[in-house]
Amino acid sequence: MDVMKGTTTVGLICDDAVILATDKRASMGNLVADKEAKKLYKIDDYIALTIAGSVGDAQAIVRLLTAEAKLYKMRTGKNISPLACATLLSNILHSNRYFPFLTQLIIGGYDLLEGAKLFSLDPLGGMNEEKTFTATGSGSPIAYGVLEAGYDRDMPVEEGIKLALKALKSAMERDTYSGNGISLAVITKEGVKIFEDEEIEKILNEITSKSKKKTTKRSRRKSK
């Protein structure tokens, strides 16, 4: 039996901020099951999460993690830290290792004491703290190539956003299980900001316009 699956997601750290981006396509075997699949979730005021893999498993994790974050805030009066949230998720996944959640997850957050934090987790609870960038899903090999070529830890947030979108766009062009739009979030000391489709489209148009100008200049040089 085929289940709905999510695909390419990207996370990166730059200039004291975390950027998360995902595509919107959910596939079921060779069928595009959903063109508006939600793969980017706000867990807390300073934490967001991306999903790739089984949609049902991932949504169950999101519900559980969101409830735990709210419960933590009720008990302590503080927001749960990104590290504590990632560790909790790692423990949940590991405790279910014999019947694993079929999903890969990226947690991005901002710790008011330690700054931007990024974690990747596998279905068995393996957790890595990422110091630069990470990607998950079937389109991740393509996304990694773009990230490797363009990443700079000290790049401003605006350039980091463009790089994340370029990585997603490249994956969507080459991976059949990725596509149908992009979701984007930036996490800073101000909190989680999830971008509207119109804002993302505007940035993508700027990237495309800049790319066309570079191509035109190269063509002119060759013709000379």
From Swiss-Prot:
Keywords: Autocatalytic cleavage, Cytoplasm, Hydrolase, Protease, Proteasome, Threonine protease, Zymogen. It catalyses: Cleavage of peptide bonds with very broad specificity. GO terms for cellular component: cytoplasm; proteasome core complex, beta-subunit complex. One of its GO terms (molecular function) is threonine-type endopeptidase activity. InterPro entries: Ntn_hydrolases_N, Pept_T1A_Psome_bsu_arc, Pept_T1A_subB, Proteasome_bsu_CS, Proteasome_sua/b, Proteasome_suB-type. GO terms for biological process: proteasomal protein catabolic process. The keyword Cytoplasm applies. Gene3D superfamilies: Glutamine Phosphoribosylpyrophosphate, subunit 1, domain 1. Disulfide bonds: none annotated. The active site is at 7 (nucleophile). PANTHER family: ATP-DEPENDENT PROTEASE SUBUNIT HSLV (PTHR32194:SF0), METALLOPROTEASE TLDD (PTHR32194). Component of the proteasome core, a large protease complex with broad specificity involved in protein degradation. This is Proteasome subunit beta. The gene is psmB.
